[in-house]
Amino acid sequence: MEILRVEPTPSPNTMKIVLSNKREDNKSNTFTYIEEQQPQFINDLLAIDGVKSIFYVMDFLAIDKEPKSDWEVVLPQITSTLNNESFIDSSHKPDEHYGEIKAEALMFKGIPYQIKLTTTSDESRKQLPDYFVESMLKAQKDGDNVVFLRKWQDLGVRYGDLEEVMNEVYEEIIALYPSEKLASLVQTALETDIVIPQQQYHHVTLNEYKEATDWKDKLRMLKEFPTPTLQDIDLLDEALQEDKAPLRRQAIVLIGMIEEKEILPYLYKGLRDKNPAVRRTAGDCLSDLGFKEALPEMENALNDPQKIVRWRAAMFLFDEGGPEQLPSLKSHANDPAYEVKLQIEMAISRIENGDEALGSVWKQIANRNK
């Protein structure tokens, strides 16, 4: 068994390994532990430090690495194992993480009271102001199992400095949960046995948005905004001019929902934003939409100082690019970030081999369902 090619996936922690042999049983399995009855090569791969799990189907493996591990160290060991070669360890400087920070809030009956940020190498926690904790305590009823009822709610992935992101998330939660909302959540918690907070959506006009003087009120408006249409673009463009990055980021999220080519200039604004989280969100939207008109903008994004943005741009060029993009790709072929470099190499290889640009996974699914 040999490796035919290695392909990045939409997840930085997963690589697709295409093999020379196809499974004969047409089954699929996920392997996480070394077990006697498993194929030897699977156990050999699981024995590699940094390999978390393996999904095996047809003629490929999807290998997940531990978040703290680095592909530049793990991938050569995978290659040598599958190709039955001896691996000679050489010193590599571990690649920095993508700047990704996982944000979570500890919730009790819909009331947040603690923030947790996690990177590949660090974790930081911060308690919300006392009135959040007091609200959480007021929401408790006799007989409540607090340990069972409290949950970590995923707030998505953020990008940047840990301290800056913590301050940003802290501000956001305070903005989204004013005292009157906390009081309402407490009342609901005390009046019902099981609390499943439902997202309430409310459409606002441009004038209503502009009349709000507090950015926290504006953020709540955007968070509670229903699926927008092109008729809402003036409001969303207004939000793109705000000083607060959370407002600009949420505006990009909403703009991406419109799914019309007319929104491209607004997503380009997001792609040039000074905040990396806004730029990455715009890149995600452009990737999901898959409009080839965005290719020049994504070529420019290969110069972004944040490697998570460059990686998204390289992924888009792999999904949508053609011969016209080869000069840009080749000029960035030595990107210092290993994952970005690998994605660029894959894009160059696909284009030079004349393989069809299939688009993102979401685009392929959408086309299949048409």
UniProtKB/Swiss-Prot annotation:
One term of GO molecular function: oxidoreductase activity
SUPFAM superfamilies reported for this sequence: ARM repeat, Hypothetical protein SAV1430
Top-level division of the source organism's lineage: Bacteria
Pfam families associated with the record: HEAT_2, Nfu_N, Virulence_fact
Family indicated by similarity: Belongs to the CvfC family.
PANTHER family the record matches: CONSERVED VIRULENCE FACTOR C, PBS LYASE HEAT-LIKE PROTEIN
Protein name: Conserved virulence factor C
